[in-house]
């Protein structure tokens, strides 16, 4: 509540910042403009503080889950815990002709393939440390969009294997963090990191502008 109130108070001071804030999207042929609130939340750094509770909640959950796997047995030391998880997800209960509800045949075959080829020996490390990195990234605000994307990817994979738990909730919250990647980490490392790294499409646009400038002959020639 305190963070939300602070965010709205900061937003009320926008005219005092003397910083031009453009909340209207450029509308061209076929372009549909976004609602003002949506543009402010996803693209205005003055509202970045409102993303903190969501980042901390999801990040803490991922870090806790990853730390448990790294410190525990069967994940980074051979992957036997993951092998057991895959086995349970692909085992057809006695007296039934199909896998448990919530699993998909094609994904079940994929899990069996990984199980038979002993991918769990390295996949366990990937999942355990991946969860830790996702949690740290969200908590410190470093590459929030990428961290949230890989978090939702793991949630989606766990869900396909028939594991509900908190996966649907974290998946939904992670999607919002992916959408707000430009400002969700502004109150964190992304404030420095994103301007430094830039974006692929930004580099393409800059190249096209430079190339167009050099290729256009001066007026009057």
Each language-model region and where it sits:
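Extended, low-polarity transmembrane helix blocks
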Residues: 1-133, 140-221
